[in-house]
Regions:
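Short, conserved loop/helix-junction motifs that constitute active-site signature segments
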Residues: 55-63, 92, 176-182, 214-217
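N-terminal glycine-/serine-/threonine-rich phosphate-binding loop
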Residues: 1-37
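Ligand-binding beta-strand-loop-alpha-helix segment within the catalytic cores
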Residues: 60-129
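Glycine-rich N-terminal segment of FAD-binding domains in flavoprotein oxidoreductases
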Residues: 29-53
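A short secondary-structure junction signal
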Residues: 112, 139-144, 196-200
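Glycine-rich beta-strand-to-loop/alpha-helix junction loops that act as flexible
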Residues: 39-44, 130-134, 189
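ATP/nucleoside-binding phosphotransfer catalytic cores, i.e., glycine-rich phosphate-binding loops
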Residues: 182-227
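Class I SAM-dependent methyltransferase SAM-binding "motif I" and its flanking Rossmann-like core
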Residues: 134-176
Length: 227
């Protein structure tokens, strides 16, 4: 069963998550030459990244993989890669290798075709951090995306998705790629997200609640109120 842990403050949550993730990475590095850390975009995890980049571990052996990305240049204010470079690929973690999902010379579909085999070599994910929307999406696996079923069920690592609720096309890790993680942490804040998580627990299918693709004994949910 997926475990829910509630924290008294956002800061305590972020510090604790940083400690857990760094310890998981150290354990993974004992048995692997390189490891894969999958991370989300958005503003919510920025304080966590600020703590994690100061953790002592062999960052030069860590591949930082985006869970999803808007197909935009990396200097665009809405780019997940931009946020991760600003908050995570800093200080002790500056030597980590970040893998982004953008090539100005390729369309979204061309990018996926060209880089699918390369991205698949980064699996399984050793440690994954995910967010979740109030619609129960995770990464860019949105319930209102026509590509959702294929992204959940196919063997590919990458998928182009065009959610009706979003202004840009996105590239997302597939359900199979996300579910490959040895350890997953879902980071959510506020009562609305907590209620969405509870609703996801009661749903029967991943189509209605894509976050369910990572539910299981290796997944922990960290929650704090926004107040």
């Amino acid at each position: 069963m997926t475990k829910l842990t509630k924290f008294d403050s956002i800061d305590i949550l972020m510090k604790t998550l940083s400690s857990y993730v760094s310890n998981d990475l150290r354990e993974s590095l004992k048995n692997n030459k390189v490891v894969t850390l999958s991370v989300p975009g958005g503003t919510t995890p920025a304080p966590f990244f600020d703590y994690l980049c100061n953790e002592d571990l062999e960052w030069q052996r860590v591949n930082v993989l985006l869970s999803d990305e808007r197909y935009l240049p990396e200097d665009n204010i809405r780019s997940n890669a931009r946020l991760i470079a600003k908050h995570l690929i800093q200080k002790k973690a500056s030597v980590a290798r970040m893998i982004s999902f953008y090539n100005k010379n390729l369309s979204e579909e061309e990018f996926v075709i060209k880089y699918e085999s390369q991205m698949s070599t980064l699996l399984p994910i050793n440690v994954s951090i995910l967010g979740m929307g109030e619609d129960m999406h995770t990464a860019s696996l949105f319930p209102d995306s026509d590509e959702l079923l294929d992204a959940l069920k196919s063997d590919n690592t990458l998928h182009v998705v065009r959610p009706k609720s979003q202004p840009e096309a996105r590239i997302s890790l597939s359900g199979k790629a996300l579910a490959s993680a040895h350890k997953t942490y879902i980071l959510i804040l506020g009562e609305n997200k907590l209620n969405a998580y509870k609703k996801a627990c009661s749903e029967k299918t991943e189509i209605n609640a894509p976050i369910r693709v990572v539910f299981g004994s290796n997944t922990s949910v960290f929650w704090a109120d926004k107040i």
